[in-house]
Swiss-Prot record:
Classification lineage: Eukaryota, Metazoa, Ecdysozoa, Arthropoda, Chelicerata
SUPFAM superfamilies linked to this entry: PLC-like phosphodiesterases
A GO BP entry: killing of cells of another organism
The protein's Enzyme Commission number: 4.6.1.-
Protein name: Dermonecrotic toxin LhSicTox-alphaVI1ii
Enzyme class, spelled out: lyase
Family: Belongs to the arthropod phospholipase D family. Class II subfamily.
Any one GO MF annotation of this record: toxin activity
UniProtKB keywords: Cytolysis, Dermonecrotic toxin, Disulfide bond, Hemolysis, Lipid degradation, Lipid metabolism, Lyase, Magnesium, Metal-binding, Secreted, Toxin
Cofactor note: Binds 1 Mg(2+) ion per subunit.
The keyword Lyase is assigned to this record: yes
Binding site for Mg(2+): E25, D27, D85
Residues forming the catalytic site: H5, H41
Length: 275
């Protein structure tokens, strides 16, 4: 999965897919009352990027629905996964559950079209801090209680906090998410800094272990082709990048293409790939 990083303006959906992304990452800014408001990252962000592009969240989700709905004039069949990076800086911990419900309501209405012929992309909720696990609980509860339980098949979960994997595992348990139940484990740092592959390799080992909790692993934000190659060889399922075309170039390498290819819609993002 090639995850186009920081796609927060509607026009960027096409821009990043044109560069080769089959997934995008979008930042979702919440108000202090736990309402999803904008697609916005803000300062600081990755080097060589403009940090302040934004859209109203409802309008963005509607545009995203069109981009992922077969038959729509805006449909992009390549776009199969969307990572929602949830910005919770202004949300009180006590409001995390309600924030999850609010996000679920907006996705049902503006992306899934009330469960009728909505967007087909898989949705990965990326929560920045483990202690906000109740956001996941609230999200899941809304879908189950309001008659949309079937949509949970399209939803996965990630805690992006740079902490012990055991702590993240506890967070999923507290959220009511079972081991290997649509879980991605992320690792990484801004492209402004260098990072070793130590934690990525630990996450890959956990994924491949019979008693591990995750299904997939992605690495962010990787822009150098040498770093992309290293991450893929280390076992990453997804590469989050500002330059999807560079990942495409890496996948053309004779040695890489013997073992890896670009994910397609029929490739289940919640299932661990076995060599």
């Amino acid at each position: 999965w090639i995850m186009g990083h920081m796609v927060n303006a509607i026009y960027q959906i096409d821009e990043f897919v044109d560069l080769g992304a089959n997934a995008i990452e979008t930042d979702v800014e919440f108000s202090s009352s736990g309402k999803a408001k904008y697609t916005y990252h803000g300062v600081p962000c990755d080097c060589f990027r403009w940090c302040k592009k934004w859209e109203n969240i409802d309008g963005f989700l509607e545009a995203l629905r069109r981009a992922t709905t077969p038959g729509d004039s805006k449909y992009r069949k390549e776009l199969i996964l969307v990572v929602l990076d949830l910005k919770l800086d202004y949300v009180y911990l006590s409001d995390a559950y309600d924030a999850g419900k609010d996000l679920a309501q907006r996705l049902v209405k503006h992306y899934w079209n009330g469960g009728r012929n909505g967007g087909r992309a898989y949705i990965l909720l990326s929560v920045p801090v483990v202690e906000y696990y109740r956001l996941i609980t609230g999200f899941r509860a809304h879908l189950m209680n309001e008659g949309y339980k079937d949509l949970l098949a399209k939803v996965g979960y990630d805690f992006s906090e740079d902490t012990y994997l055991s702590t993240i595992h506890d967070g999923f348990r507290n959220a009511g998410v079972r081991d290997k139940d649509h879980i991605w484990q992320s690792d990484g740092i801004s492209n402004c800094f260098a990072r070793t592959l130590t934690r990525l390799k630990e996450a890959v080992s956990n994924r491949d272990s019979t008693d591990g909790y995750s299904n997939k692993v992605y690495y962010w934000t990787v822009d150098k082709e040498t770093s992309i190659t290293d991450a893929i060889n280390a076992g990453a399922d997804g590469i989050m990048t500002n330059h999807p075309d560079r990942v495409i170039n890496v996948l053309k390498d004779d040695e890489i293409k013997k073992k890896f290819r670009l994910a397609r819609y029929r490739d289940n993002p919640w299932k661990t790939f076995r060599k």
